[in-house]
Amino acid sequence: MKWLVESVINHLNTVLPSNIVYAPIKANVLDVGTNNEPRKSIALRIIPAAPGQQYFEGETIRKQFQILVKSPNGLEAMSSIEAIADELHNLHMHSFHSIDDSYNLITLEKYVEPNWVDKTEANEQIYTALFSVELEIGGN
């Protein structure tokens, strides 16, 4: 869902400092580094989710997404994913900087805590966290 990806990226770029969002946030994939040139990278990808609830006057949309961060400095990657997860968890209770009002954010919650994923051949550390979102079409 393009709106969700662009809105979350916009929100994170608006509220978090550059030492947390230390690379451009891309959709779906992390940049690939080499042994001679490791690369810092942040990615957001939509992952499978159950359908939303049906209501008398419409329905909600449920989406889940994963944020991955990668850096040759493991502490930098860990600090970044923890700050991103803290910012996004229960975001529906705060101000959400979406790209437009096509959807109304009902809930946005972290459902898997930040954790280590892997170390690449270029000695980059990858961390991730998973989030669940419920949206209503035609926000306010």
Name these PLM-found stretches.
Residues 1-57, 91-97:
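Small/polar-rich, solvent-exposed N-terminal microdomains that initiate assembly or binding
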Residues 35-37, 60, 101, 124:
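A generic structural signal for short, non-catalytic loop/turn and secondary-structure boundary residues
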Residues 59-75, 125-137:
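Oligomerization/assembly interface segments of phage tail-like spikes and tubes
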Residues 72-93:
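Mid-chain, well-packed structural core segment of small domains
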